Amino acid sequence: MHFLNFFNHLAIKNPMRFKLLLVFFMICHTCFAQQKTVPVIFDSDMGPDYDDVGAITLLHAFADSGKAKILATIASTKFEGVAGVFSVLNTYFNRPDVPIGVPRGKAVTQRDWQHWTDTLLANYPHQVMRNEDVPDATELYRKILAAQPDKSVTIITVGFFTNLASLLQSRPDKYSKLNGRQLVQKKVKRVVSMAGKFPSGKEFNIEKDAAAAQLVFKTWPTPIICSGFEIGEKIKTGLPLIHNAAIQNSPVKDVFRISIPMDKQDSAGRMSWDETAVLVGIAGYGPYYTLKPGKVVVADDGSNTWVSGKGNHAYIVPRMEIQKVQELLNDLMMHQPSRKE
């Protein structure tokens, strides 16, 4: 029987078996597709919380294994020093020349209350000293995207939607004759975001710039996969890292060493929201998660609701045991620099 005829026959005669087979093929396709090197723009608030540091560590670990190519690391906040923090971490992982961007316009300025950013800037080498030393975030997005193959770039955003909204609203420039939405449609394969609480709720990354999140979820032209608050809340990481005596002079270890003891709720490790977005963005969602397709709707107050069915959005649902995902993330967060420039 012809392959397509077989599927049509199966869909009519045995709908349940057809659905299971379809899910199997989707998972296989996702896993196969993710075997290639994934070109990534990493967009992070890098400051109010410290799971961003775990996330960028995963990013560099995947890059060292050939699974990711880091095109840029971009801040969605603009507290003074955020560019330097990115520079510290990129330099530590032997990628000091990865482009860094910071928003020039209106943006959140909230930073870490534990002051681990000050420790990194005072104790580790970095080339970037001031936010003014790096390009505007939107300009850098346009420059990087314009130079990439069509439908190739994965944007992993683990902060606010400030930059993505600005990118959508950007006008043609010296890098591309396309406006922002056209450029995204042409160059971006998908967005994977740590954002929202599902099926409904209020979550920090959306709430802090709700207007930007509304614009992105209403008008972004390519698929968006969300790792919601409920996913990372259950995954605790960082203790194996800070107890590993073999890891010395590590900014990543210092961040978790400083921060975990300062909050009783972190006694078993820090909740790991941002790391899950990097895992899905580069390794794929299977076998760790399944996808719930539909549409994210953001209210004016930053709360989100979910409309199941057709839509360009999806949120992840646990598939693998949480403990196994936790062990994987803890292992990746102990990754040491292995690539020399």
Where are the language model's segments positioned?
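N-terminal acidic, glycine/proline-rich low-complexity segments
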Residues: Q34-E341
